[in-house]
């Protein structure tokens, strides 16, 4: 997953596929396919996001729908469906699309000229804030600037080396040295989980059945792959999630020798039903179908 400095236009071109979304834990610290995870299923985008690691909400725009008002920079109001505001209530309401100045990420979103984005997902081509998978990456999106309504670039800081990477480097190195334990987890990974609002890693609870979809690595000459150690897999998951969208992915995948596991899969998007239209009024062409 790469970086994008343009996140309010049709030139964005950075999105996430379902396989990557599925890597995010539940807030209770369990993988989505684990017993007792509480995963709500993937047949409804609201359900996909419900009770997940909050870092998902800050990386991919959560789903919502509002009613548009009138004017060049329209106001908006809630729909009659309570589900449509679930993630607006979590992220905070973007009360004024013309001059936000209210925080890093608020809903509903707006394009570079502050025009309201009335719903997410926006599937297809030809309009702002659209993508084909339904999972629009907004890692660098910000609503801090009170004069934001005339620009398509983001002003979020881009630190090159930060404490999160230091902690994740230490956790992975300690495992490779054979000394990763609960004490190390508490000083590294659990510092990040506390901040994110995810239940802490308990090393003793992580066994071969902890994640039924655990990844494989591929030593030279081995085409079938070998399951990654379950604890190491959780350390790597934390690195993937915390550093998502910051340019680390391709280097980590190569270093871990896991490219076949990550890349040799169909790139699917959100579950589609016939009731959900792929065509928005502002879009002149029919998009390619999502598998």
Q: Locations of the language-model features?
A:
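Acidic/polar-rich alpha-helix caps and helix-coil junctions
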Residues: 1-282, 286, 291
